[in-house]
Amino acid sequence: MKKNTFIYVLLILFSSFYSCKENTSDDSEKLAALLLLTQTQQQTPEVSPCKDRFAIDQVGIYNAKEIISASAHTGTGFQDSHCAVDGVLGLGNFNGSLDVFTLDTSGSGASLILGWNGKKVQNTAGTDFIVFENPFQQGGNPNSVFLEPVIVEVGNDQTNWCGWNPVYNGGGAFSTDPANWLRFAGLRYVDYNQITNPMNSVSLFNMGGGDGFDLGDANFGNSGTGCSAALRADFQNNGFLYVKLTSAKVILPALPIPGANENPDIDGVIAKQVN
């Protein structure tokens, strides 16, 4: 395990890289490698980068601020689950946010369950909630993204879950094209930043990035442990309490996801309406 000073140097390098490359796509593959290296090494830093931040709600923007289950949590660095509920801090097309909670590649730590403090996310017109991870474009090509696929499910009791029947169409090799990952999260880069690029609800749900999910989608309820037609109807009519985010390969082990893309980094989840 590396010294904390090494981690701080890496973070400084990240900051410098962002400053120089903010509006370009050159060397994005190097950024992917540096992001992975930093997250791999930053296991026990003394200070969490997220501990003093909090999510900002407004009409039509309701952050999941309740941590129900986060087995990968250690309280430090990218293993601080507070980073998943302290507000979304996206960095645009070419940069992955460091304000994230990294999931494990196996076991209970490969999942994160969040809630809205007893309120239910409602079925509205269009997208009902957005999952924000930290993907970014590689080589200036929107069809080549550093992505870490996430399977999204919702529930009321932490036992029975309904999902969106995610499907991979990329064949036997790992694809960096988001179009090959249907109904997964962790695909779309994030423009919304509650501090540097705030938006109202309409803008956020149309152009803020992240991956949106709709309870009215025809695929909703076609996957998930314990999901039934009755449970799906209940979610659609009355809403849900919890959202569960899981590293895709844990649920679908046949997916050709390499090690560098196995453990997603969660920036947050935002709902359009809660009650």
Task: Describe the role of every protein-language-model region.
Residues Q43-V150, P166-N275:
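A domain-level signal for the mature, folded cores of soluble proteins
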Residues K2-L11:
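Sec-dependent signal peptide recognition
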Residues N4, S15-I56:
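Bacterial Sec-dependent N-terminal signal peptides
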Residues Q158-N165:
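Surface-exposed loop/edge segments in extracytoplasmic proteins
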